Each structure stands twice: as C-alpha cells, then as structure tokens.
Amino acid sequence: MTFEQLIPLIIMAFALGMDAFSVSLGMGMMTLKIRQILYIGVTIGIFHIIMPFIGMVLGRFLSEQYGDIAHFAGAILLIGLGFYIVYSSILENEETRTAPIGISLFVFAFGVSIDSFSVGLSLGIYGAQTVITILLFGFISMLLAWTGLFIGRHAKGMLGTYGEIVGGIILVGFGLYLLFPI
C-alpha cells in the first residue's frame, strides 16, 4: 500500500473516530474511573475493527441499501443510551448508578461503531485492503474515544451534578443529528 493510498484511509478513520469522540464526551461526564475509561476506549476500538470488517466482508456481496439501515440503528441506539443516562442521573442516587459495563458498554460501543459498518460495506465493494483499514479504524477510534472520555471527565468537574445530564443530552443530540443531518 502506497502513502497516497494510506492518507484517505487515515482521514476516513479520523472521520469515523469523531463519532466515538463526540459521544465519549457525553459518556465521560458519568462518574468513571481511569480503568473504566481505558476499558471503554479499548472496547470502542475493538468494535471499530469488528464492524467495518463485517461490513467489508458483506460489502463484497450486498448492495448499498443496508447503509441507511445501519445509520438509523446507530442513531436510535445513541438516543436510547442518552435518555437512559439522563433518566438515571435524575432518578437515581450517585451510589446506585453504575458505570457502563457489560451489555451497556457493548451497546454504547456498537452504537458509535455502526457507522463504520456502513463504511466497511462501501470499502468492501471497492476492494480496500482489509487488515490495514480495520486496524487504522480501531486504533484511531480508540484514541479519540479516550480523548473524549478524559475531556468529558474534566468537564463534569466544572459542571457539577448536572454533568451527567449534559452528557446524556449530548448523546441524544448526536443521535438526532445522525437521524436528521443539518
């Protein structure tokens, strides 16, 4: 792979990773430990490897009509997660709230990586080099997710108890933006 072929993939990886960065800002406003932040970033990175890989494999066989479905599903997942965070911030005590682990972490990672499935479909149709592409997507998304989580964590300190509500609203807003782009 030449440098000229690598540059568009790096740009695409940053574009896909910005989804993870944006929603990680909101997720970072939850009360998270450093270990949880690292785990969330790694999970997002792994999903940004798995989803485009599946998309690239299927892209060789399927039409482009599934791109809109993936985009819609990702938006709905983000909106649902955002409402859940707002709900839990308002109605639950700090002690009873849990960090995103288990299924909620996978739902979050799936939601921010589903757009990479659509990109994988397109890249699969055009025969992009799979290994380099998915590793770039995963690594850059992981770094951007960590950046968003750390920034969100520090912003929560400035926003006080309203930080998680703001984070949930960011997720809802981002999901709505995916559904209804301006």
From Swiss-Prot:
It is a multi-pass membrane protein. It holds the Pfam family Mntp. GO terms for cellular component: plasma membrane. It is found in: Cell membrane. Keywords: Cell membrane, Ion transport, Manganese, Membrane, Transmembrane, Transmembrane helix, Transport. One of its GO terms (molecular function) is manganese ion transmembrane transporter activity. InterPro entries: Mntp/YtaF, Put_MntP. The chain crosses the membrane at residues 6-26, 37-57, 71-91, 101-121, 131-151, 162-182. Signal peptide: none annotated. Belongs to the MntP (TC 9.B.29) family. Probably functions as a manganese efflux pump. HAMAP family: MntP_pump (MF_01521). This is Putative manganese efflux pump MntP. It comes from Bacillus cereus (strain AH187).
